[in-house]
Amino acid sequence: MKKHITFALLFAAALTAQAQQGGISGEMLNQIKQSYKATPADKAIRNALGGTSINTLALNQENRADFDTEFSHKVLSKGITDQQSSGRCWLFTGLNVLRSQMIAKYGLDEMEFSQNYCFFYDQLEKANLFLQGIIDTSGKPMDDKMVEWLFKHPLSDGGQFTGVSDIIEKYGLVPKSAMVETFSSENTGKMSNLIGLKLKEFGLQLREAAAAGVKPVELEKKKTEMLGTVYRMLVLTLGEPVSTFTWSLKGGEAKEYTPISFYREFLGNDLTNNYVMLMNDPSREFYKCYEIDFDRHRYDGKNWTYVNLPIEDIKEIAIASIKDSTMMYFSCDVGKFLDSKRGLLDPDNYDYESLMGTTFGMDKKQRIQTFSSGSSHAMTLMAVDLDKAGKSKKWTVENSWGSASGYRGHLIMTDKWFDEYMFRVVAEKKYVPAKVLDILKQKPIRLPAWDPMFADEE
């Protein structure tokens, strides 16, 4: 008995020693402290940072000269939209691409589609996507990875281009005057929180019913009743979507439309089949087709599918599109090195290395692998400045943060920033080389919904 006790004590002591070896010991702490040699410059920096933001002190004064705002190729843009305090950048961007086409086609002075109309059905469809996902996984335990992901993401106001195609192809479009913004459409946080909370409650009820042996047809009835509750919550916060409306083109004779007839008459794009998403993700193999599981806005919609390309290939496609006066859906890691006052995206905007006395040496691939960078915001790519050799020098996007933000509502990015923090564009297939389109014929490599590279754009 004593032998066993002695062994147990020795084993416990060994584990404790092993744990201590991985911690910060007193000796190690002394070494760390001694490695820091305070200098007069350090004291000045500490004093400054005590009452000033890091970005203010890291601002690179050598990069403060006025930057060139002229571009060799630019798509006509009329009016800046504002998503306010919402994560609907993906929707504003998609609609801005379409309104540019309508303005050019009909010579309009202005045009804006109702973001609120599309957003209403986006939220309803996402609610159904969640509830049906819960039914489909009802036989799996709560700690299953997919079940866990569903309950963590019942719905959000963010998204990407597949949401634009999913919603418009099914529900059409209306002018902004037919369904205007509300407080909750412009400030989505509380509404999304309440609907998400209710959906999680409904999700548990559906799992309990399935576990009790309720038949699929009865689960469908329960889901329909639940969606009725969500519909009411959406009507109270966003208003009820119009089914018909009257509208005239350039002061002509007014005509009655449905959202679908309006879309088909004035645009009629096949958003599902005429566009292709292109990604620059150096952490994965190029010239391959990828599909993100369950990453769609409708249960009966299409999973997000894209072709992964080197950055130079994407630039060639983007340049071809802009030269032909066609805007593009574009997404990037907008918060990196953004000088919001000037509306300039440039890795040379801030010199964090000189301020902190160290280097930040990860490349794009390493930043993706370590969850340090990823697409966070969608905007409309609408201009490029080319040198005499036809190579890009800088780019411009039309943003959806209002006309007072950035450079007159736009952001200008250097080509270097484009290389490092641009992640995807959506191009019309007519601008994409045949060899790239052929990649779409491959069986896509399926990635899980929780892959960190594919969070919603907000």
Q: Where is each model-derived feature located?
A:
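Bacterial Sec-dependent N-terminal signal peptides
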Residues: 1-22
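Papain-like cysteine protease catalytic cores
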Residues: 115-245
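Active-site signature of cysteine proteases
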Residues: 213-458
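Second-shell loop/turn segments in exported
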Residues: 75-87, 149-155, 301-308, 317-318, ...
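Structural recognition of the beta-strand scaffold that forms the well-ordered cores
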Residues: 91, 117-120, 166, 175-178, ...
